[in-house]
Amino acid sequence: MRRTRRPRFVLMNKMDDLNLHYRFLNWRRRIREIREVRAFRYQERFKHILVDGDTLSYHGNSGEVGCYVASRPLTKDSNYFEVSIVDSGVRGTIAVGLVPQYYSLDHQPGWLPDSVAYHADDGKLYNGRAKGRQFGSKCNSGDRIGCGIEPVSFDVQTAQIFFTKNGKRVGSTIMPMSPDGLFPAVGMHSLGEEVRLHLNAELGREDDSVMMVDSYEDEWGRLHDVRVCGTLLEYLGKGKSIVDVGLAQARHPLSTRSHYFEVEIVDPGEKCYIALGLARKDYPKNRHPGWSRGSVAYHADDGKIFHGSGVGDPFEPRCYKGDIMGCGIMFPRDYILDSEGDSDDSCDTVILSPTARAARNVRNVMYLHQEGEEEEEEEEEEEDGEEIEPEHEGRKVVVFFTRNGKIIGKKDAVVPSGGFFPTIGMLSCGEKVKVDLHPLSG
């Protein structure tokens, strides 16, 4: 029997298929190896730093440098990042800048070659050496430090690096672009330091809106763990205990010419621990409005009013997202004006803002008619080292509160020396409010 000879081209095709199969397996293995290398390559690195989401806090012994390096470098499409200082700690030795990928974590950013950083404690720029040059102002809790690379730098491989403070450019410097890119870095060097990292931050254009933001910032006399962005206030504190209060106090007290203000709850955050009220000028920054002497406030989370005490009285329903809380003063006709030159010439006609136009009964409540109304006696807590200010008949007023344009209640109070300042407190993460310090006109 004659054997049939298998065609040669069939054997060749099978060999080609086998080679293709092995090439495919090698290709898959190579892809897996590349992914593993990239996964290892793009990992955030840190030492003596505790990382909790986007929050970084110092976690070393005194004298040890803490350093954090982000997992990916800045790019042409993502060329800017920011760091918000939550707590400046003991010395405020916080550094923000750019470093090579494998930068030594035992040194502050900017101390070693091919790195640059803006240091908060002295306002100096450190560019590859342990000695800095004067660059900008010092930074404290509540400040934001930004760092970026001009987009054109990615085409010429020479990095033009700029820094910002609270959204405003401080200055710039030039350094060679590292082959692997320049990575966002944060350094810390003392106990208690804590920051919030914003790797996807965007730098707004410096136009008329920035000038408007500046004018709004000027309206605030004190800001603690609160960020101002136009009319918006954002809580920046830890929100972990009752002393982590974020406080915003207006620069000027309420007067017969400006006796009312409003707050809209934009974001209630985790707990809606938002308080609106009035307080003396030297009110403690770590006490919620209403908790300590010389203050009275309406709290959104429980609908209670607090008047110089940590125990509140039932007042009205709670407030939620979108609600507008208001606070004002009804002045008696015989009110004794402070030396600020307050006058009641323009206060006979009061018109509410559109958001509270339904509250027509607020229109003429600036003056309190004294017709035998009984004054409630409020017991005020005496804080350590402070004396209760004696009541003065000519400085007794009625503080009133509104909810969505309607008066919901009143509280008798004595105006402290210097006046009652609009004060807003926040105490849980994510809280944001929109403030109108001058909702009335006329």
UniProtKB/Swiss-Prot annotation:
Residues 372-390 have a biased composition (Acidic residues). Pfam families: SPRY (PF00622). Residues 371-394 are annotated as: Disordered. InterPro entries: B30.2/SPRY, B30.2/SPRY_sf, ConA-like_dom_sf, SPRY_dom, SPRYD3_SPRY, Ubq-SigPath_Reg. This is SPRY domain-containing protein 3. It comes from the Eukaryota. Residues 17-204 form the B30.2/SPRY domain. The lineage of its organism: Eukaryota, Metazoa, Chordata, Craniata, Vertebrata. PANTHER family: RAN BINDING PROTEIN 9-RELATED. SMART domains: SPRY.
